[in-house]
């Protein structure tokens, strides 16, 4: 695979920092540009982040002294230096939409961690193991944007990446009704216990916009391409409750599901065990070898023990049981800033690179 020069837009935030650490020794991608808000522009990356470095590993040495660029004012300059950008900015939704489109129109593809373009009909929202074929919509999107190379591809919300992968191989039994209660880590809000002390010994029963995303995004991920847009699937019916819990990393979901054709417990376990996607077939650098891991123990998965499974890119599942109201219930866990954010973004970029979309 050839090498690609990349930029991180929004490099100073938590997801931007995670992108920086993941790309430090990436076999295909070299970080050439770091950009953020005007107040960071002109400073070194180290100066711009200051005491806000939230990763457990040190800031990549090769990036410390890189001079920050202005994500909005320097679009043309950035586009000239890189093959594509990762976008993880903290701005208003309509501003993000405008920004990402400006990069795409400057012939600089955008792999976005933001929610702004997730429901743009010709923007693929991809979990690489689940709907890799949605990247084919890029041809139609380029037509609309009037670009040769430029496009926007997004990853889905971190909350759905715990339970949608577990449900996906079971779709052949006809998913009917899904209830998911998510217990979401504070890093999902870009925070640590140091910056959000109110979360110690606390639980907040509301995360703005999260329930809507958690109920609607899976329907697009499972949708189909028709007439140059992605049309959402009508089923299953999904209802969610999303809670912020005092955990640093790792989103857990308690899932209840009913089927058109109820499978046996053994059939479900077999589906999870044997499921493999395009990233595994292509052996993409960030892909977990085994995407779905099932734990037999009653007290697993646990955020502390299992979130880093396969470099934080695998999904952990446990406690599969029959249910009196639904057919089955189970618990699943994913690392929200790895699989759920930057790691999922890097994996999506690897898929796009392998399929020639950056050439």
What are these regions (language model features)?
Residues 187-359:
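Charged docking surfaces used in two-component/phosphorelay signaling
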Residues 1-205, 237, 309, 315-316, ...:
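N-terminal Rossmann-like NAD(P) cofactor-binding subdomain of oxidoreductases
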